[in-house]
Design a protein with these regions (language model features):
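N-terminal small/polar-rich segments of proteins
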Residues: 37-127, 167-207
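Sec/Tat signal peptide C-region and signal peptidase I cleavage site
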Residues: 31-37
Length: 207
């Protein structure tokens, strides 16, 4: 056979033998690796937690009182301050006796917030013409802290419109809170003598 052909065949045989050796080494390396299916599973956990708080309660403590009013031929107003319980009179009418704000007391959980819904006005009825109680507002005290927007009366707290709701946070360690309410009574001209009564509705719920 020609010399060149013999050299070519020799090279082919050498390359074939080298490839066989590399293939054998690769197979041996694969056999020494642990099977992927044998790896252990990985697990993690999360904590499930729930906090149960005391339900909100609210009870009546005292009524809103405007004292004794002496009417005149012209109308006037008597306003009970929601923070102090003091009375302010406008017009020719006279007011005698002690005024007081309405007070409610409740219990909840410290640092939780609640929303208050308070009516804006109500009627006082009696033997004469109905008197309107308006500007019903919530006062400040040391058991609660108001959050959210301020209102239009300049005090920064309270409610000036029915349907609006103010939020407060209970800040006492015991969870006891107080809500004081004042308002303005519109006395008609020559209001008939007698006792006049109305009602104020307030609602609180956790937020």
């Amino acid at each position: 056979m020609p010399w060149g052909v013999t050299i070519t065949n020799g090279r082919l045989r050498a390359v074939t033998r080298a490839a066989s050796v590399l293939l054998a080494l690769a197979c041996a390396a694969l056999l020494t690796q642990p099977a992927l299916a044998a790896n252990p599973p990985v697990s993690v956990t999360a904590t499930a937690r729930a906090t149960v708080v005391a339900p909100l309660t609210l009870v009546w403590v005292q009524d809103l009182k405007f004292g004794r009013i002496v009417p005149r031929p012209q109308p006037g107003t008597v306003t009970v301050d929601q923070n102090t319980g003091a009375c302010t009179v406008t017009g020719p009418i006279l007011e005698v006796g002690k005024c007081q704000y309405a007070r409610f007391a409740g219990m909840g959980t410290k640092n939780l917030s609640a929303r208050i819904t308070l009516i804006s006005l109500t009627d006082l009825t009696g033997p004469g013409q109905t008197m309107v109680l308006d500007q019903i507002m919530l006062g400040t005290n040391s058991t609660i802290s108001f959050v959210g927007n301020t209102n239009a009366n300049g005090s920064g707290v309270g409610l000036t419109k029915g349907g609006n709701a103010e939020r407060f946070t209970i800040i006492t360690n015991s969870g006891i809170y107080l809500l004081n309410i004042g308002g303005r009574l519109n006395v008609n001209a020559n209001q008939a003598a007698g006792v006049y009564n109305g009602s104020i509705t307030i609602t609180v719920q956790y937020q």
